[in-house]
Amino acid sequence: MPLWLQGVVELGSVAVVSYLLILLTVLMVWLADGFDSLGLTGGFVLSGQVWLLAHLTPLQVALDPGAGLPATTGTVNLVPLGLTLVPFVLAWHAGRRLARACWEGQFWQPYLSGLAVYSAAGAVAALLFGTGEIAAGPAAAAVFPLVPVALGAFVGAYRASRSLPGLIGVNAAAWVERTSQYSRWAGSYVWAVLRAGFVAAVAGVGAGAALLAAALLWNWNDVVNVYQRLGTGVPGDTALTGLQLGYLPNLAVYALAWATGAGFEVGEGTHTSPLGTQTGPVPLLPALAALPPGELPSWSAAVLVLPVLAGVLAGWWFLREGENHLDDWMAIRLPARWITFPLSTLLTGLFIGAVAGVLAMLLSWLAQGSLGLGRLTVIGPEGPDVLLWFGAEVAVGAAVGCVVGPWLEREPPFAPLRGGASGEDPGDGSGAHLGRAGRREARRRRRAEAAARRAMRSAGPAGGAGSSAVARPAQGRGVADAEAPEPVGAFDVDAPAAPSEVRGSPER
């Protein structure tokens, strides 16, 4: 099968399967008399509208006053992120299969052809499932669904191939090798800061999810009372629970925003945060029964420590990476450690906090939105507020994590080396018995050996094909199945040891 056609089949299947999963859920509720006046055709239309909303496509709402409701026009763009994960995960697996079927540098062929078909499917869905009350613009439906699918397919392909040169045919490592030593240190430092910020964001979302679970358990009686007051029966309760599960990731992001101090809104005039709550009428949904009361206890401000702890975890992770080349560079330029160490630690904390704040702001923008009706036009946190609050708290925690990180390690900084001063690992190869200095020396030696192997392949008779990061597959093997070189970390090159490796660990 041609690669472009395989991309069409794979991503076209993602569109069909994701729609069928939503349709199955709607039909189950319909068969249980959950939608009295919907009808079978209405079930297909409602499933298509939910499919578009799950793909980040805004829906235009225009209620007819003849249906017993006040005339209202608005935009529904409160995306159920739980349903957005469905096409993302399906595209992840499709990207893995496409990566295994491609030669080096050919992934863009099935990738672009599949995305073109997915864009056309979104435009067709907008035309088929639009009604007089709810509709989506064909142009928006052709663009927005590409976001979760393109991201999922690319991430899945990268996870399968573990090589950007194998996917796009551009060897960034070869370009980095031609730069100066300071440029290589800067690249390694920036890459480590980006990953540390991602660690802080993931830890923050996890803390928000734990806070949401604790709030639901604490207010479980109120949640059950709302179900009983609604009196929708088993079919209605099932549909309502499914709706809330679709918005569960949104609620976790709201809990994160609440823990940072930025807070969030549930309609115009209703804002809640640990520093104060402005009460107002809220929709009668069971999950909203876990909202904090108007009068908060004095200890509620203690939740502000959760983002700080996420920053401490990110700072500790950054320290364990051993890529603090900003501190190395400052130590070379200015020998006064009582100045360079606090300054580099503060700057690193600020950089990690900025990355984590930007990621949290993006999550807030995805989780917030409008239902287009009445007061429910503003739901969720404000992205800039989350950026400032979460970024500042993570920055403080990351600086603390970089300082206390050495005391969190199990082995002392100057543990005796059984393998001698060279840092060799004479044991089982795990390096668990080596001290920090020994592990750094062993890591430097492995990097040098990997660089030497790359140089030998570049000088071999195979020419340019032997110097690529992923060799051309033999006997029908794809990019993901080809034997890749030993991973040596981002921006690893044949370079002299960093100053931190020469000086050893600082004294406690």
Placement of each model-derived feature along the sequence:
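Long, glycine/tryptophan/cysteine-rich extracytoplasmic
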Residues: 1-85, 128-129, 225-308, 365-508
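N-terminal membrane-targeting/anchoring modules of bacterial envelope and secretion proteins
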Residues: 1-229, 234-238, 407-416
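Alpha-helical transmembrane segments of multi-pass integral membrane proteins
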Residues: 105-168, 213, 217, 312-425
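Generic hydrophobic-segment detector
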Residues: 134-138, 142, 146, 187, ...
